[in-house]
Amino acid sequence: AGEPKLDAGV
């Protein structure tokens, strides 16, 4: 959703 941390949970 544009946010890598929230997108993949990285």
Swiss-Prot record:
Keywords recorded for this protein, A-Z: Amidation
GO biological process: vasopressin secretion
Modification type Valine amide: residues: V10
Role this protein plays: Antidiuretic peptide that triggers the release of ADH.
Name used for this protein in its record: Pneumadin
Organism for this UniProt entry: Homo sapiens
